[in-house]
Design a protein with these regions (language model features):
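A short, well-ordered alpha-helix in the C-terminal region of glycosyltransferases
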Residues: 245, 318, 325, 332-347, ...
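Carbohydrate-associated surface elements
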Residues: 142, 161
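Conserved donor-binding/catalytic core segment of Leloir-type glycosyltransferases
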Residues: 181-197, 203-206, 222
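A short helix/loop element that forms part of the nucleotide-sugar donor recognition site in Leloir-type
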Residues: 167-180, 211, 356
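Aromatic "clamp/platform" in nucleotide-sugar-dependent glycosyltransferases that forms part
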Residues: 272
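Short hydrophobic beta-strand element within catalytic cores of glycosyltransferases
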Residues: 289-292
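Short alpha-helical donor nucleotide-sugar binding micro-motif in glycosyltransferases
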Residues: 251-252, 259-264
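Conserved acidic donor-binding segment of nucleotide-sugar-dependent glycosyltransferases
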Residues: 304-305, 309-316, 325-331
């Protein structure tokens, strides 16, 4: 069987907690139990069966890593297959990878996680990079359609699933653990607190609730994540007098996200765009009522009124309406949650993901 090398820099959980990083962690851990895997990174991970190749953490690490990969593989010809995760980075990074792939005649699998097409200014560089690959994987149908049309390629869609599990205690237990009001209606947001995720939108929506509505519906927002907008959000919450309606839990280890799902009545994802959101998948797995922004990558997973609710991404007014619709009728919210789980079971299976990658990397 071919030896496979994953190029991950430091971009894997637990050092980074985005969906791509969590997915790569579980993928390498699972595949290395069945096939010879090596990974190039600046830090070692708990991959029991995978070989670690250390790259010095020199900056800019995204540019230094492909150079290190080239030098390492020059002297280790037994590795002919490489796996790269494509996301937002300087065009020079992908140019270096493309030259290394062609020079060393590597069989590359490129996994596209980035939800938007790349800037048109460097079209030829990205086109050559993608065409140097033996396989190109897109993590959503929307990404496939965008990149196929832009670059004349044919991506294979493989969803970024991880092996989800459910929490073993009830909602009340975790609300006590995380100091969340027992009798509130919890709306959970999971992930990085940064601009394209629009974590402020739910605060803007809460500002539209009058006193009677806050008492009646008892909304309580739980942020499970950290990021550059954390302090800005805390200031906004305090300045609007909403501190009793919002909890900031900070960075939550991935295995504990199931606890957040267990105590949530609803899950909110407010992004400008997504590939296939790992946290949304986990919410669907946990039968949560979902509210999502009506954007590419999310409307492919959520059908308004069927397995969740959609709102226009820049409209806190619509978001408020969606929240009230969920909170005013528990039977309707439960129905949407069951439909979300049904959609998950119909479309997603971690074993299918592993088998797809094993087929690609044979």
């Amino acid at each position: 069987m071919n030896k496979v090398i994953f190029i991950i820099n430091d971009g894997v959980y637990p050092y980074h907690t985005g969906g791509m990083e969590v997915f790569n962690y579980h993928l390498i851990k699972s595949l290395s139990a069945e096939m010879p895997i090596c990974y190039i990174a600046s830090q070692e991970y708990d991959f029991d069966s995978a070989k670690y190749v250390r790259v010095a953490p020199l900056k800019p690490i995204k540019i230094f890593t492909p150079l290190w990969m080239f030098l390492y593989l020059m002297f280790h010809p037994e590795f002919k297959r490489v796996v790269l995760s494509f996301s937002a980075a300087h065009w020079l990074v992908w140019r270096i990878y493309e030259l290394a792939i062609r020079t060393l005649r590597l069989k590359a699998t490129i996994v596209i996680h980035y939800g938007k097409t790349v800037p048109p200014d460097h079209f030829s560089i990205y086109s050559k990079f993608f065409r140097s690959a033996e396989n190109i994987v897109a993590v959503s149908e929307d990404i496939k359609n965008n990149y196929d049309a832009a670059y004349g390629i044919n991506c294979k869609v493989v969803y970024p699933l991880i092996p989800f599990t459910k929490a073993d205690k009830d909602s009340s237990y975790y609300r006590v653990k995380y100091h969340v009001p027992i009798d509130s209606n919890v709306i959970a947001m999971v992930g990085s607190l940064k601009g394209m995720k629009n974590p402020q939108r739910i605060i803007e929506a809460l500002c539209l609730f009058d006193k009677e509505e806050l008492v009646k519906y008892k909304p309580h927002v739980v942020y499970a994540g950290a990021g550059p907008m954390m302090e800005e959000l805390k200031f906004l919450v305090e300045s609007k007098g909403l501190s009793e309606y919002v909890s900031f839990l900070g960075l939550i280890p991935n295995p504990q996200i199931r606890e957040i799902m267990a105590m949530a009545d609803a899950y909110l994802i407010a992004s400008d765009f997504e590939g296939t959101s790992v946290s949304l998948l986990e919410a669907m797995y946990n039968s949560k009522a979902v509210v999502a922004s009506n954007v590419p990558g999310l409307r492919d997973m959520i059908s308004n009124g069927e397995n969740g609710l959609l709102y226009e991404v820049d409209s806190p007014e619509q978001l408020k309406e969606c929240i009230i619709e969920l909170l005013k009728s528990k039977p309707d919210a439960d129905r949407l949650g069951r439909a979300a789980r049904y959609s998950y079971d119909l479309r997603y299976d971690y074993k299918d993901v592993l088998n797809a990658y094993k087929d690609l990397l044979r």
